[in-house]
């Protein structure tokens, strides 16, 4: 490893180390939200709510592709960071090679089992009438790009795992920048509508994945793309999948939750789906910034779990304080100019009113949601596979009954409030799990929460 990477892992001031690892991730996730918003923003100029709904309905599929990337990216990435903390550099080459080609194989399987059934999958997602064909066309492009989307998530995690967060950010910047350029060209110039939006995202992911491959081939002595090293053994599989499977389940259940939510919203009409799609993109700004903060420090936590547990504790305290500051700023913004923010995407006043309401409700859960992100990251970083698995299952198990109960009692308003209730319960569950495992983490969780 390079001396600079070791410096941030071991010696730099905690806040400086946190920002070194997290800031590129925060910027990258923020930019990814921007091009997600731009898809809807550009499509919004066509003044067709069916197209906005089509893009919104595909969110669960993207969550599943992200989950497949996390299966190897998070699982192998945290393992690589622990190996580096233990100074076992050679083993990381075998871990990375197996994960890269495993991810590509998964992507090819996705194409084979989904592409012939894109119409049926669109219907399952809740697409009806005019929205059905639009959603199906968007999905076809997503499925064809699956190997590169999965590979992008894996390689981006590896860049952070080895202490090169700036490379991670550059890769994401390249992807976002290219997508911003391609969207208007493909949507308007070639008159491809939602297919143009999907193609812009797909091409951008291909370019970013190729960037990471070239970087690792030329610059890394701990991550290998040599297929000859893709030889797993029992220990490697155990270490990768005990964290990778919970990360995968978390994304899959997030996608399943999105599917169930879409079905509930579809019952209340196209305006409900479009309203949620707009508010979801706006909530993603602070949510993914916080997620970037929490995911960014996972390699730092994983490394110091092996090398310096006192430093690990200081990192966690700094992250909690940062989450609190972000929460306060975002709440002020949403409750003062939220209506104007939503108005950027549509002139339909019914959608503006509903999306603003959803935005305020979901933003309220940001603080506990952020704590949940952090504690889930701690479980992943420290190799607590059982705790991470329980947390992943709970995230899916909690939201479904809450949705059914709130919908039965309060209708559409209940569906919206169920998001806040479920997020809060998940965060409390994460805090409880970390507290119960505190001896293994050697972190006094109650002290962190109080201090």
Curated annotation (Swiss-Prot):
Record keywords: Antibiotic resistance, Cell membrane, Membrane, Transmembrane, Transmembrane helix, Transport
One Gene Ontology term, aspect cellular component: plasma membrane
Transmembrane segments: 26-46, 54-74, 97-117, 139-159, 170-190, 194-214, 245-265, 282-302, 318-338, 355-375, 397-417, 418-438
Pfam families: MatE
Subcellular locations according to the entry: Cell membrane
Keyword tRNA processing among record annotations: no
Keyword Transport (UniProt): yes
Topology with respect to the bilayer: Multi-pass membrane protein
GO molecular-function terms, A-Z: antiporter activity; xenobiotic transmembrane transporter activity
CDD domains referenced in this protein's UniProt entry, alphabetically: MATE_MepA_like (cd13143)
GO terms of biological process kind: response to antibiotic
Annotated coiled-coil segments of the chain: none
Function: Multidrug resistance efflux protein.
Family to which the UniProt record says this protein belongs: Belongs to the multi antimicrobial extrusion (MATE) (TC 2.A.66.1) family. MepA subfamily.
Protein name: Multidrug export protein MepA
Species the sequence originates in: Staphylococcus aureus (strain MSSA476)
Gene for this chain: mepA
């Amino acid at each position: 490893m390079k001396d600079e990477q070791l410096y941030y892992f071991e010696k730099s001031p905690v806040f400086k180390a946190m920002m070194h690892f997290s800031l590129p991730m925060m910027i990258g996730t923020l930019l990814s939200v921007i091009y997600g918003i731009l898809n809807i923003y550009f499509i919004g100029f066509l003044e067709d709510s069916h197209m906005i709904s089509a893009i919104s309905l595909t969110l669960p599929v993207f969550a599943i592709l992200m989950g497949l990337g996390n299966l190897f990216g998070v699982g192998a990435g945290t393992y690589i960071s622990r190996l580096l903390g233990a100074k076992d550099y050679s083993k990381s080459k075998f871990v990375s090679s197996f994960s890269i080609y495993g991810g590509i194989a998964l992507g090819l399987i996705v194409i084979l089992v989904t592409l012939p059934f894109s119409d049926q999958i669109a219907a399952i997602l809740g697409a009806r009438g005019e929205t059905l064909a639009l959603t199906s066309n968007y999905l076809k492009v997503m499925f064809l790009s699956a190997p590169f989307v999965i590979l992008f998530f894996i390689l981006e995690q590896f860049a952070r795992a080895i202490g090169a967060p700036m490379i991670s950010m550059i890769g994401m910047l390249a992807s976002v920048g290219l997508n911003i350029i391609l969207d208007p060209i493909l949507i308007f110039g070639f008159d491809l509508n939602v297919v143009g939006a999907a193609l812009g995202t797909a091409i951008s992911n291909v370019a970013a994945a190729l960037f990471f491959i070239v970087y690792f081939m030329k610059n890394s002595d701990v991550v290998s793309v040599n297929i000859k090293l893709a030889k797993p053994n029992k220990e490697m599989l155990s270490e990768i999948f005990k964290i990778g499977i919970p990360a995968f389940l978390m994304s899959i259940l997030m996608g399943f939750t999105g599917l169930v939510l879409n079905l509930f919203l579809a019952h209340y009409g196209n305006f409900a789906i479009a309203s949620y799609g707009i508010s979801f993109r706006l909530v993603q700004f602070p949510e993914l910034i916080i997620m970037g903060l929490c995911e960014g420090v996972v390699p730092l936590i994983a490394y110091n779990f092996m090398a310096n547990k006192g430093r690990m504790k200081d990192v966690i305290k700094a992250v909690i304080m940062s989450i609190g500051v972000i929460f306060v700023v975002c709440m002020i913004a949403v409750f003062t100019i939220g209506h104007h923010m939503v108005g950027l995407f549509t002139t339909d006043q019914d959608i503006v009113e509903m999306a603003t309401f959803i935005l305020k409700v979901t933003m309220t859960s940001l603080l506990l949601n952020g704590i949940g992100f952090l504690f889930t990251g701690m479980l992943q970083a420290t190799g607590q596979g059982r705790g991470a698995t329980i947390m992943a299952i709970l995230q899916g198990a909690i939201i479904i009954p809450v949705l059914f109960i709130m919908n039965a009692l309060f209708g559409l308003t209940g569906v919206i409030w169920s998001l806040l209730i479920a997020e809060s319960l998940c965060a409390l569950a994460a805090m409880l799990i970390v507290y119960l495992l505190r001896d293994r983490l050697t972190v006094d969780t109650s002290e962190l929460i109080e201090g």
